[in-house]
């Protein structure tokens, strides 16, 4: 990876690791490493199936699968009484273009109709030189595919580092809120907000969160995820 790219990543952690992994349904994790060690309220209601679709930030780069964001999110939702099942459909290295290529196939491969799909893509687009317009078009196509199937969408927004210049940064940062407004989706404007300024919450590559960093992300976003579920009560 070129030195200039490393300076970009040091300015703002982004997801950028190769290697593919199939989507998998998260299994119940050992409570020792969970955000919530025991349910705070009894789990009740119909099962809420969620597809967590993204890159290495979802796939769980260099952490055990029970410590990935989707796994810890499932545990946190269940601790709030939500009968959640989260499928980890994160693949390390995915750009929005790669995500679009597998999006419909991933939904087709599920043995259920999900109540929510979380789309977390865009970080690798910055490193691969995709324009904000390309990223926007790819994510828009995924939203349209989900809405064609009547599946609600939650967008996990990213931010461009200042190294790209103010014009690019403004265009990239705005694409998530613009898409959420245009398509009426739920949105977390910058889903790394709770950790990105603390280097101790990242692995040595300064890109991927540690287990503690992932726990912090889940704690900061679980309410938004619950609120994006149909007929959910926050």
Report the location of each language-model feature.
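Serine-esterase "nucleophile elbow" of acetyl-processing enzymes
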Residues: 29-92, 104-113
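Short histidine/acidic/glycine/proline-rich micro-motifs that form metal-
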Residues: 57-60, 64, 90-95, 124-126, ...
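Alpha-helical cap/lid subdomain in secreted, periplasmic
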Residues: 100-234
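Sec-dependent bacterial lipoprotein signal peptides
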Residues: 1-15
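Conserved Rossmann-like nucleotide-binding pocket used by diverse enzymes
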Residues: 13, 87, 154
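Sec-dependent signal peptide cleavage junction
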Residues: 22-29
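Bacterial signal peptide processing site
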Residues: 17-21
């Amino acid at each position: 990876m070129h030195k200039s790219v490393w300076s970009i990543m040091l300015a703002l952690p982004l997801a950028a690791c190769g290697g593919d992994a199939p989507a998998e349904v998260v299994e119940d994790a050992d409570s020792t490493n969970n955000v919530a060690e025991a349910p705070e309220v009894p789990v009740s209601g119909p099962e809420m199936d969620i597809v967590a679709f993204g890159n290495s930030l979802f796939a769980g780069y260099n952490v055990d699968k029970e410590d990935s964001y989707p796994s810890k999110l499932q545990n946190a939702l269940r601790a709030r009484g939500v009968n959640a099942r989260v499928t980890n459909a994160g693949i390390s290295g995915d750009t929005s273009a790669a995500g679009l290529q597998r999006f419909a196939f991933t939904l087709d491969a599920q043995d259920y109709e999900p109540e929510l799909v979380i789309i977390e893509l865009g970080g690798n687009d910055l490193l691969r030189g995709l324009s904000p317009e390309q990223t926007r078009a790819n994510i828009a196509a995924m939203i349209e595919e989900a809405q064609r199937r009547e599946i609600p969408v939650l967008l996990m927004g990213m931010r461009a580092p200042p190294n790209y210049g103010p014009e690019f940064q403004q265009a990239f940062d705005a694409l998530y809120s613009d898409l959420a407004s245009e398509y009426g989706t739920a949105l977390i404007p910058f889903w790394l907000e709770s950790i990105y300024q603390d280097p101790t919450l990242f692995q040595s590559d300064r890109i991927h969160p540690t287990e503690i960093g992932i726990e912090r992300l889940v704690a900061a976003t679980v309410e938004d995820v619950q609120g994006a579920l149909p007929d959910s009560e926050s």
